[in-house]
Amino acid sequence: QYLRMKELHPDCILFFRLGDFYEMFNEDAKLVSKELELTLTSRDRGKPEAQRTPMCGVPYHSADAYIARLIAKGYKVAICEQMEDPALAKGLVDRDIIRIITPGTVMTSSMLEEGRNNFICAVYRDSAGTGLCFCDISTGECSVTSFTGPEADEHLYNELGRFTPREAMLSDGAYSDGALVDFLVKRLDCRLSLIH
């Protein structure tokens, strides 16, 4: 079940609900253990160490604090929840991914920085010009604009600096602009993803 869910979202750290804990396995466990300074353990204790499955976990009731720390570091987290009561399950407990959290899609107040918007943006660029959209899904605030002409880059950078998005989705044309990518990553500490 875990491997099937992880295959659906290989770019996410998978928080897999097992009883009162969210568990991470394999490379996710190694990464989370290092990033959050958690103890790395393993399954299959009877096997040689090289064949054991690395794992680490966090209590489900305090998972938001751990997720917030991972999001602040730019990671994406997929939450895989138990969809039925384990006591009533016949065989494996049915599980499904109920939420994917990225730096720009945080909605839980405990994960948000007080007094600061949490914008996600989309930048579309082609030979005709540049389109730009900002949205803070925690407040519903949204802004859309476009730029053409010789001052388009200046306007684009001004708007990006004004809104300071936590995450940016870039079209192929925008992603191929090295200066734009550097500005977003190095100046704004923004997580990037490519959209087609």
Pin down the residues of each PLM region.
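Basic, polar low-complexity surface loops/patches
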Residues: 1-195
